[in-house]
From Swiss-Prot:
Pathway(s) annotated for this protein in UniProt: Amino-acid biosynthesis; L-lysine biosynthesis via AAA pathway; L-lysine from L-alpha-aminoadipate (Thermus route): step 2/5; Amino-acid biosynthesis; L-arginine biosynthesis
PANTHER family cross-referenced by the UniProt entry: N-ACETYLGLUTAMATE SYNTHASE (PTHR23342), N-ACETYLGLUTAMATE SYNTHASE, MITOCHONDRIAL (PTHR23342:SF0)
Alphabetic keyword roster: Amino-acid biosynthesis, Arginine biosynthesis, ATP-binding, Cytoplasm, Kinase, Lysine biosynthesis, Nucleotide-binding, Transferase
Name used for this protein in its record: [LysW]-aminoadipate/[LysW]-glutamate kinase
Amino acid sequence: MIVVKTGGRVLKQNLDRVVQSIIKTNNKIIYVHGGGDQVTELSSKLGIEPKFVTSPEGIRSRYTTKEELEVFIMVMSSISRNILSRVSSYRNSIALTGADGKLVLAERKKKIIVIDERGRKRIIDGGYTGKIKNINKELLVTFSNLFEVIILSPLAYDPDESTLLNVDGDQMAFALATALRSDNLILLTDVEGVMVDNKVVNKLTVEEAKELSKKIGPGMNRKILMAAEAIENGVKKVIISSGLVEDPIKNALEGKGTVIE
């Protein structure tokens, strides 16, 4: 069982090849997709102004209001069903959210610290974004025994507030891979791997990943920090690779990109 995650940007640019790659691989797959760009597009069409916030660490992320959560749910459902319809003729597949069967439980972020337009720290309401707290491993194993491909949208359930929450797709992929102690966790991105001085870093140990995370930009630094933590918690290998090539999953499994182990 491998876990594969692609962001919305990769899906916009290379959806057909990603789908074919899922079909062609011999591995059972848990496939987590993003779709942030698509959410922004639909929100704008509906007259809902997308809102983004910047953390003190310099990470820019979506701020999910109640209105935009509804858009997020619509877009994620559309993406997952589109992929399901293409894959199902070839592989036994199912499309889920993390909320289905309480597969992924999360806690709503009550307050978050952001940097405002004047560069000052502010504390604001957390909106409808969540932090993953628990994976129902027993249910996940049951699904993986029944289906070759599990397509998962990054939505989780908050049992305390009885609501769906937008969760970070990378965080969901890492949580799932860690729960299953997966052999491979593949992050398909719009770059070839971890870049240093315009060159791909081919291999990183856990310690090297932690050290490098201090020197590269926000976004990728979070990926390699989470990768290091996943390896320490039982995942055998994390591969950060391009999702824009002919056969992205095969390409990653062949070691193209950055391998952390």
